[in-house]
Amino acid sequence: MSDGFGKIGFSGTLRPSQVASSSIIRKELESGSRELLIVAPPGSGKTVLGLYVWSDLVRLPTLVLSPNSAIQAQWVERAKELFHLDDRESEIGTDPENPGILTSLTYQSVTLPKRGGGELDESAMELWISSLMTPDLNDGSVEADDRESALAWIADLREKNFEYYSDRMGHYRKKVRDSLSEHGNALWILHESAKANLKRLLEVGVGLVILDECHHLMDHWGRVLIEAMEFLGNPVVLGLTATPPEGASNSSVDQYFDLFGEVDYEVPVPALVRDGNLAPYQDLAYFVRPSPGELRYIANVDEDFKSLLGELKGGAENVKGRTPKLEVWIARVLDGLILPAGRAKDWNSFHRRDPRLADAARAYLASGELNLPEGVPQPSAELVAGGNSMDVLITILDRYIRNGLMRSESEEDHALAEDAKSKLRMLGVQITGGGPRLCASPVGRVMAYASAKYDALRDILRAEMETLGPDIRAVIVTDFEKTSATALVEGVLDDDAGGAVAAYRAVLGCESTDRLDPVLMTGTTVLVDDDLLERIFPRFEQWVSERNLNIKFDYIERGGYFEIRGKGKDWLPRHYTMMITEMFQDGVTKCLVGTRGLLGEGWDASRINVLVDLTTVTTSMSINQLRGRSFRLDKHWPEKVANNWDIVCLADEFTKGFDDYLRFKRKHKQLYGVCDDGAIEKGVGHVHAAFTEAEPEGVSETMEIFNEEMLMRARNRGRARELWGIGQPFNAVPREAIEIKGSFGEGFPPANRIGLVAWSDESLIQAIGDAVACSLQALGLIRFDAKVGGGSRGGGWMRAYLEDASEEESEIFAEAMQEILGPLDNPRYVIPREVKVVSETWLSEMLPKVIAKYFRRSENILSMYHVVPSKLCRNLEDAKVFEQQWNWKVSPGEVMYGHSKKGKEWVSEIKMAGLAPKSSFHRKSVFT
């Protein structure tokens, strides 16, 4: 686009995903597009892609904006390392006062708002006054009747509690700034330094703005940048992110797409792994139980909840002015179709106005075998089955508290309502004027920061050390440096439970893991193992000296470790993060402990091969950034496979005993992973087939077995790498799959062949799948090149799905497999399955094994009956097609009609004889 760039250009070779992305960008630029958005995971080379757009495509002065100084510096480092700059290195930098052909800044540098100022403070004061005079939405109360009393209220607060006054003033300043930026005055609210930076960039003639980690632009930054782009003359805008908007408000999403338009190109993680551009990985989980003290606390909270239910169920009865007990109140509400705004005219109207109450109330009464009022429809079996679930109870209790107890004339009912609300808060439910809301739960906190997690951490590290030896590079990530216990859990959790310091002490507290020479680094603190100090301290001083940084080091002994102190203008997180990361890469320390704020977005250490996630964060943005740390290729270990660990606390006998598992499930909602059968799955099921969307099946009873299986997987990185199928293409179209758990594999295939291998669940389900697929092909329901994939998922679970098929075809196959391996529920046709049973004879017992197999006795016996899938038995002719395939691949046998009187009796006898399948199923979407 411009000749002013001379010989500046990329001096390397783009990866396949970068070639694909850049070709899309080139076409968009040629068509006149000025808004571009590329979505790609951490480690996929977004920085190089952005620089390539600068140097080879746009070739105009460029501004790069990043969320923090570490990422800001990386752009300049990559440009100088990988690009031919035609001796113009001096025009590339991070100084906002000296912009050049490539200027890398933080978002804050051009969006910093005013901290005060006459006009802003005046507007904030007016907004505060207005809020004091506005009736409360819940009860209609007001703090001030007129302007004078509002001003007096604020003046009194300023005099008596200046700290709180300042806090509220800051709150209203922010509201004013947000309002101004939303309505087209974003630049007016900027700090003078931000305005000056924008003016200098305008003078330099910025033609391209690269917005890195642009998922941050949903609020203030995004609103300001929309106007800033206009101020800069509408340059080309390139957004780079691993996580596009998810679950944000409509206005925020609209603002985001005003900047970028729709996604131009998205690169899924599995595609990059299979292309060899990201390291393969496996997600692993280790389960623990709360300690005895923690269990007592959880049990007490549970007991309080049960006593609350008992109190509400046994409440006042026929007492004037009192709200009746829970069941009576619910029945009266349903009988009278009573809602806070008045009675509904009929059931349909009642259900439409409050469907959650209508369904929960019916389910609750029916599950307790209580009669429903006349005219109220009976609930479905599914609703009744969940009649005592937490979802139903919370809905019932919320309406009873808000519409019953709190509207009562009785102060006793009011007190009961407050007691109920406080006990529900312990379980993470807050009853508000608008209904129940999730809130931080003390029980959830105890589960998240359970002390047993530190024992698990040491078990994991020991297993990884045994496998990796001196090549281990472990990173442990927590939410915060220290996580102080709240008053509600004081005495249950240690003072710093859940924090980086606690995890660090846990690693030091074991002789074997202490040999990792761990280092802790957060935004404010650096701690070094006492065994490591003599070796690492000179390295620190050398590193600083080589870079001419103004830093003087000191250290303080803390008992088993040292705190590193630094003085000088360059003692900043971005400098010591780079320094310690380099020591980690070189193996001076083999374990880093830190917070997600520092070791998450933008942090880069390619040698990580063990990541232990002790955070409680569940948003896809944070999770993708965190997990992306371990995906990077390691030039020192081309066969690298990273193990990403979660530690999950379970206490399933209690009401909130699955809280930590639900958090684990949310973490994995948007994560891809490879499964035991080589399929790629998004969601928690890729970690193990027993981990379902509802709850982990059978984990509590066999926790040690699950943990040992996970440790075995951790040791077998070669198998994980093989499962990823590196070099194979990735198909981003999801396939419907069926997972089955049952006891099917017994005996031998009933064929007249010698030396056959006995059926296993895996081989039998594969054979049944082949029979089903071939039948569907013969009837023209699926394409002929489709084939059955799948295999063992561990824990007794098998999976089957259709490869090289459309979404519709894969769904047809999965449904057919669930029918044929499922119960005999009113089947149209059934078919028997025989197996061959082999027994020894007196002669076979005397002969060598190689010869004995020819003299063993064998006979076919009936093993089970199966439903003929509905798609394969629309008529007898179709059923005979299936019968033929079944006979070839599975067993001899004829289809039999089950809808006649005789057939129904016969099916009933089969069930009574225990010859029907008894299976559990999961339906999943997988990628191949």
Cite the ranges covered by each PLM segment.
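A conserved SF2-helicase RecA2
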Residues: 272-279, 605, 618-624, 631-712
